[in-house]
Structures are given as structure tokens and as C-alpha cells.
A protein has these predicted regions:
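A structural signal for the hydrophobic beta-strands that form the central parallel beta-sheet
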Residues: 37-38, 69, 147
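Alpha-helical cap/lid subdomain in secreted, periplasmic
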Residues: 29, 50-63, 75, 79-193
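Active-site metal-binding loops of divalent metal-dependent hydrolases
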Residues: 41, 72, 102
Length: 193
């Protein structure tokens, strides 16, 4: 009997911890929302935002909203930080989505002399940049923010000319962890996959 009470108490404590640390699930877009999608080339040319818009316009034709792409090919989080006020908040959004990680995580450096040191430097830079980005996002109190975890990198693909960047996907996962942790207290989070 004592063991059952102890297990029940442990289960209760763990559920409080898990629920307290769960990221927020973003709420659906609403009538009149102005949504800006911040990102890199995946946002600029990936068209996922147009699919989201098509879903809303075909399922809820009377729900008018505007959606804008603020994706720029080749951008890393530090590039996005430089343009976030003008390119994103200059459109007076009610919702901002942000995704980054592919360019932040680097490329050919994984095949260099010291990829471990490179990853440490990049993660410091991404973390510092993301903290500054979060301050800007929090200062726009009337705007909901949704973090979208970065896309994965396929380290198994090979051809005669290119060598895969082994370790890149692990770095992307570290960046996604930063985004997910931010979602616990301030924003929503969606995995890209």
C-alpha cells in the first residue's frame, strides 16, 4: 500500500513538471489576422505559407486575413535580426512565425579541421542572436509569435562531387531546442516535420 502511494505521488509530481514545461500550442489564425512568416530561403521559396493561406481561404472563405512572406534566401538568424523591425513588424502583424537553423548551422565547416569548435561558436552566436530577437518579439506585446523548428538535413545523401556535412543535423536539433525552450514561456512552437 505504501509503495502505491509513493508511486502515485511520484506520478503527480512528474505530471506537474511535464505539463509545466510543455510548449504552448499555437492557436488557429483569426479573422483579420496579419501573419508574417520570417525565415530564410525555405520560407522565401518553399511556399508553405501559401499552402496555409489556401487552407484558410478554402475552409473559411469568410475569414479574411493577410499573409506575408519575410523569407530571404541565405539568411541566418543574425540576418533576420537586422531586418526584423522593418521587414516583419513594419507590416503591423498580429501573428509572426519565425524559422531558422539551416544556414545558422553552417555547411562545409563540418568537413574542416575542427567542426566541434565551429559548432560551439555557431551555437553561441545563434543563442545570443535569438535572445536579442526574443526581446524585440516580446516588445511587440500585441503580436503572437509562433516558432517553427528548422528543417532537418539529410546526412545520408551522397554523390561523387559532394561529401555530406556529418554533424549538421545534430546542430540543427540544438537550434530547435532553443526555439522549443523559448516556446515554453513566451511563444508557440511547431516542428517543421
Amino acid at each position: 500500500m505504501r509503495t502505491n502511494r509513493w508511486l502515485f505521488s511520484l506520478a503527480c509530481m512528474l505530471s506537474v513538471f511535464v505539463c509545466g514545461n510543455a510548449q504552448k500550442t499555437p492557436s488557429p489564425f483569426q479573422r483579420g489576422d496579419r501573419v508574417v512568416f520570417l525565415g530564410n530561403s525555405i520560407t522565401e521559396g518553399g511556399h508553405y505559407h501559401s499552402y496555409i493561406w489556401l487552407y484558410y481561404i478554402t475552409h473559411f472563405p469568410d475569414m479574411r486575413m493577410r499573409m506575408y512572406s519575410a523569407g530571404t534566401g541565405g539568411d541566418s538568424s543574425w540576418d533576420m535580426l537586422e531586418r526584423i523591425e522593418e521587414d516583419v513588424y513594419g507590416k503591423n502583424p498580429t501573428v509572426v512565425t519565425a524559422t531558422f537553423g539551416m544556414n545558422d548551422s553552417g555547411y562545409f565547416e563540418y568537413n574542416g579541421d575542427n567542426p566541434t569548435a565551429f559548432v560551439e561558436r555557431q551555437m553561441y552566436r545563434v543563442d545570443t542572436t535569438f535572445q536579442a530577437m526574443q526581446k524585440i518579439m516580446k516588445s511587440h506585446k500585441d503580436t503572437r509569435v509562433i516558432m517553427i523548428g528548422g528543417t532537418p538535413y539529410d546526412e545520408t545523401w551522397q554523390n561523387e562531387k559532394n561529401k555530406p556535412f556529418l554533424g549538421k543535423n545534430a546542430t540543427i536539433q540544438k537550434i530547435i531546442r532553443l526555439q522549443r525552450e523559448a516556446a515554453v514561456t513566451t511563444v508557440g512552437f511547431l516542428p517543421y516535420t
